[in-house]
């Protein structure tokens, strides 16, 4: 963590699952300060008390800023002294964004523009924007707004001065706030049907720790304008539900198929065919560099890419597919699941 020694890191949307994972990873390191920037004072107060109890000797490294990425001035107010930013603030629930698309635009699109504008003005060293697989070939409002977020990040990276701007794309982060596994656990414990949308639907899966690893990889190895993804495995929703049933004593016959929700796909894409054609293989990750050609139309129309026709997209149907036992092992290794199985219960990320 020496690259963060004495530095100030700001996390937008910092009271969420990702912000908690970063705090647990960083607080006992030599980092100077972590700023939690968010709009919910109750969540900030809960977080303040939690970390004062958990890490009393280092909790003073956490500083809380009430603000909203939708408001440029509140972003500017939080920037003085910030060295790096992890931009995690987002509206991410697919059905909610379908019904309120302009709210998704305000947070995911305009909010990102505000954060990046304020960061560039303040001379912040690096901003890592957290995106989603739903931004590739988007069909729903959440994915479309996150795709525009990425476009804004790449566009601003061309004129960002000393500020490095990168994006990371995630699949499903297991047991993050609003995800399905905690819902299934509650359904099993309450004796209710275990609801899933479509058994054959596939999703990339990763842990919160892997989510933090991806952001740190982008921070250390990404170049200005890059999009970085992890080579994540996938599983079907049916396999995931059965794994949770086996871990928590649920009955597979209690699984109830309720149908695909508003805006959902049968499978998700982490890299499009076009992105795969120029992606750099970096071991456990892919790096997609920005297309930094200018608006020289003659050159733009004459430069082609034959490689594009020879390659597939990277999606949750053609990546490595976890079987039931592999899925169960991956879920069972999560800290959230360990605490739930130990009887502590109601463990909130």
Region roles according to the model:
Residues 7-29:
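N-terminal Rossmann NAD(P)H-binding glycine-rich loop of SDR-like oxidoreductase domains
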Residues 12, 79-88, 129:
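Rossmann-fold scaffold of SDR-type NAD(P)-dependent oxidoreductases
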Residues 64, 104, 165-168:
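Hydrophobic/aromatic anchor residues within beta-strands of the central parallel beta-sheet
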């Amino acid at each position: 963590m020496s690259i963060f020694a004495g530095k100030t890191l700001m996390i937008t949307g910092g009271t969420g699952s990702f912000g908690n994972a970063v705090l647990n990873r960083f607080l006992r390191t030599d980092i100077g300060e972590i700023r939690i920037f968010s709009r919910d004072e109750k969540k900030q107060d809960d977080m303040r008390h939690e970390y004062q109890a958990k890490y009393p000797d280092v909790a003073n490294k956490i500083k809380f800023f009430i603000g909203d990425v939708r408001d440029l001035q509140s972003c500017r107010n939080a920037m003085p002294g910030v060295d790096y930013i992890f931009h995690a603030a987002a509206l991410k629930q697919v059905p909610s964004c379908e019904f309120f698309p302009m709210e998704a635009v305000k947070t995911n699109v305009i909010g990102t523009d505000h954060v990046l504008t304020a960061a560039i003005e303040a001379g912040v060293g690096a901003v890592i924007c957290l995106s989603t697989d739903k931004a590739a070939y988007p069909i729903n409002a959440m994915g479309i707004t996150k795709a525009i977020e990425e476009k804004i990040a790449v566009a601003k990276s061309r004129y960002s001065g000393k500020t490095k701007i990168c994006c990371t794309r995630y699949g499903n982060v297991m047991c993050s706030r609003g995800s399905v596994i905690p819902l299934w656990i509650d359904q099993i414990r309450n004796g209710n049907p275990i609801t899933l949308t479509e058994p054959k639907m596939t999703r990339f899966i990763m842990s919160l720790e892997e989510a933090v690893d991806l952001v740190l990889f982008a921070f250390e190895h990404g170049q200005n304008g890059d999009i970085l993804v992890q080579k994540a495995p996938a599983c079907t929703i049916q396999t995931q539900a059965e794994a949770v049933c086996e871990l928590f004593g649920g009955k597979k016959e209690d699984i109830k198929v309720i149908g695909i929700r508003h805006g959902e796909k049968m499978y998700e894409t982490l890299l499009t065919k076009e992105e795969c054609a120029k992606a750099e293989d970096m071991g456990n990750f892919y790096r997609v560099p920005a297309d930094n050609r200018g608006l020289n139309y003659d050159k733009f129309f004459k430069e082609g890419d034959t490689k594009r026709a020879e390659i597939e997209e990277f999606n949750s149907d053609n990546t490595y597919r976890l079987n039931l036992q592999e899925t169960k092992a991956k879920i069972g290794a999560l800290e959230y699941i360990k605490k739930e199985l130990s009887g502590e219960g109601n463990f909130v990320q």
